[in-house]
Amino acid sequence: NKASERKHALCMVSGEIDVFVKKHPQSIIPKNGKAKLISCNDPNGFVWRGRFTDKWQASTVGYIASQKAHNALRWLISEQGIQERVGTESHAKKVFLCWNPAGKTLPRPMRRMRNADAEPLQKPSDYKEQLKSTLLSFRKDHQLQDTDCAILASFDAATTGRLAVTYYNEITLKTFLERMQDWDAHCCWHMGANGIEAPDLLQIVDCAFGRQVKEHKRVKKGKKDWEEKEINKLETDEQIQRRYLQNLLNCKVNGGIFPRDILKALTQRASSPQAFDEANWRKIVHAACAALQKYRYDTKQGGNEMAWELDTKNRSFQYGRLLATMEWAEEAYYKRKYAGEKEEEARQTNAIRYIYDFRQRPFSTTERINCLLKHAYLDRIDKWQANRYNQLVGEILSILREFPENELNQPLEDLYLMGYELQRNAFFTKKDTTNHTEEE
């Protein structure tokens, strides 16, 4: 009869005659419902079956092949693979895996390579040397060879019943490590107190597309006491998160160009500080600068902007420096007036408040901010700070005068963010903070 005919069939995986499987294992990924990789349970209510009259004509998988594949995958996910989950803990809809067939430990492709014991670095050359050293130590510690293999895969569950392989790649370990190092060497920026480092892929996605939400977090107060603290964090919709994490992973592993749509989202948000609190906006600016540097490197426009001299002849870059200088002068006034008070941290400067207008009409907006500074702030800060401000503004304007007059008020390119960040970082270096002793 029909049932006995189908008991044995050609396994389309192994190419051998075997007992075919009607129902394949489910729940391959823990906490992911009953999602199946292979499912053919549609005797009625199906959408489209093409030319097939029954489900067995589409494919047949033998019992041995099915058990080997599903058990190996289940073991990889639980034991050997480097997992990066996307979604809530109770239902992780997407799982990224990275493993070596010989069981050797590999670096996490979704994370930056870091040396936990290293001091924060401020010089790009020191950062790249540390990156090379970290990679060499990792290879030595885990006995990695150039001929070893790295396998990357991602699994996505659109529903609780269906699981799909959305990405699969096999590359040599030499290529894999080179691309990990190349990404971290160029998609990086000054991250405040952490020094120069590359943002994680999830951090980039959250900065580009996350909405700001409030979260209650327990923080330690003293040796034994804890307190509830309300903080703002960036949280991205799961569907958006899954899509763009996949794009970034493809770019990082395959050595592709940094996605232009993600870069555009980052730079637009970096020009909208009013939508975020101070801490989250700074994270977005840092991520935008890292992404911009990587994109310029990928498209052969640059890629080593952190090593730029402050007198670089670029209009947008110099306007960014000017923005940071005006912000610094006003912050100096707030620090003096509200020293140690919450008002010092909460007050937003005019330079940041007008940043959108500044990007569209830099020259006229500069005049407006500078006028506010002269009338309300410069006379109330330390003399050496006022002298430093006037000196820097004079230097920057002398460079800008070298450009045609009709270009001075044209909209700025994204490079103004880099000029702003590099000048702001220069204000907080030891060299700059000690300059006042000489100027006094």
Where in the sequence are the language-model features?
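Short Cys/His-rich metal-coordination motifs, predominantly Zn2+-binding knuckles/fingers
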Residues: 14
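Short metal-coordination and nucleic-acid-contact micro-motifs, chiefly zinc-binding Cys/His arrays
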Residues: 3-9
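Extended alpha-helical scaffolding segments
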Residues: 1, 18-440
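Protease-labile, long low-complexity intrinsically disordered regions enriched in Pro/Ser/Thr
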Residues: 8, 17-18
